[in-house]
């Protein structure tokens, strides 16, 4: 039976199918922040692919804890990059399908913000949650304040396995899930720049 997440988790919660998070893990931090701000609005409303979700630079700055002058550029760049993103899957009949996250982006210079138009396929993914589509949830404000490149990914993994009391991950899986560059094959770099930095920030800023 599907869960009515609009009732249980309002727009200040981040609720995503686990497979959706796997698709967006290669995005930049600013793209992920924009996605995190926009998706709860898509989940809790009845918008279609013809309806925009507006994210202002002032809201982006406030929720992410960054300066407004930085937010203008970060939001526009993230909007542009998110528009180029797509993900793929293989249908039951063997067809290989590619889907864009967004069908249109309008940067409203006079209003200092971006209008995002999600595709119908993505809107369905953002609203469909049941036993066949497991999901992970956490407060939006927690992850938006994380500033290290991989802290958000680590936090999602921790929340995904929270009911188990912890989790183990191999180095190969860590590289795949975080899409780490080859430079982190050196264990010292991996520990200092990814694991230690992300753990320190998430432990300090999250539940």
What role is predicted for each listed range?
Residues 1-207:
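Charged, alpha-helix-forming regions
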